[in-house]
Regions:
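Short beta-alpha connecting loops at secondary-structure transitions
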Residues: 10, 68-77, 140-141, 151, ...
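Hydrophobic alpha-helical scaffolding
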Residues: 12-16, 77-81, 93-97, 129, ...
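Acidic, glycine/GT-rich loop-and beta-edge segments that sit at the periphery of enzyme/chaperone cores
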Residues: 80, 87, 225-275
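Acidic/polar loop patches that form or flank catalytic/metal-binding clefts of enzymes
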Residues: 36-39, 89-92, 96-105, 206, ...
């Protein structure tokens, strides 16, 4: 229980405790093995429910505990993108392309180039699955005609590419076919980014009406503990989502992702022998 002096003289029962990303996984109702959520903040944090057995990663991910419920432990695979929304902040604050992050969507949609520019936003290195702290940011395909719209679009694209890297690693580690990705966090409000994420991953993106999944997950855990909800099926009834489905041809997706992988290799090679 909590200390009474902090809660209006009442001792409130503590019904659940969870790390922020595990709480978000629960809040996104990823109760089944193979279900995946991704939180889009300054960075991105993707977790996959791998069921009641841990899957030691061989592809640069972290094996972790998701939660314990009714005496059973659920495990997860986790991958982190270091730079996501913070790259949009860089466009806003350092390059002054726009005044609010929300405007980035409008700029991206007005870009003339069709994903020809590639940005590798390794401002603090690259996270999963590379774990390369020495890599520096880079931009490939720039010409005299490259505009702020093109750079904004490419920066948003880079967020989606990095998450594709992690999702592919999860598929390799778990041998689970992933049908959809549940998203939350501030940058998930960007429709351009979510549509391109669906395209580049070739999977359905589900964005719930309430994107504060971390707080929701904590509430679910506490509510289950005190009997506000009696089981997970009751919680599932509360889900309403906006759906994004892939629109891009698979051949085009493969070409774009191959260019991204080439750009990452070049960026990593540039700093490889600096010592």
């Amino acid at each position: 229980h909590t200390a009474a002096e902090y809660f209006f003289g009442k001792r409130v029962p503590i019904g659940g405790a969870a790390g922020d990303q595990q709480a978000a996984l629960f809040g996104q109702q990823c109760f089944e093995r193979g279900s995946v959520k991704n939180t889009y903040g300054t960075g991105c944090f993707m977790l996959m429910n791998t069921g009641n057995k841990p899957h030691p990663s061989k592809h640069g991910l972290v094996t972790t505990i998701a939660w314990g419920y009714q005496g059973e432990i659920t495990y997860a695979l986790e991958g982190s993108v270091f730079v996501a929304g913070s790259a949009v902040q860089w466009l806003r604050d350092q390059l002054m392309f726009f005044k609010t992050a929300k405007e980035s969507e409008k700029l991206a949609l007005s870009a003339k180039e069709e994903h020809e520019l590639i940005v590798v936003p390794a401002f603090v290195g690259l996270g999963a699955p590379y774990w390369d702290n020495d890599c520096k940011g880079a931009m490939f395909g720039i010409t005299r005609g490259t505009s702020k719209e093109d750079m904004t679009k490419a920066t948003l694209d880079s967020i989606a590419y990095q998450n594709r890297d992690i999702l592919d690693a999860m598929k390799e580690d778990s041998s689970i076919a992933i049908q959809s990705l549940r998203v939350d966090g501030g940058a998930s409000a960007n429709d351009y980014l979510m549509q391109f994420q669906s395209d580049i991953m070739q999977c359905v993106i589900e964005r719930p009406e309430n994107v504060e999944s971390t707080a929701l997950g904590a509430a679910y855990l506490a509510g289950l503990a005190v009997g506000y909800w009696t089981n997970l099926e009751e919680i599932k009834k509360e889900r309403n989502s906006h759906i994004f489905t892939p629109l891009m041809k698979v051949s085009d997706v493969n070409d774009l992702y191959e260019r991204w992988q080439k750009a990452v290799s070049c960026a990593r090679m540039f700093t490889k022998n600096e010592e």
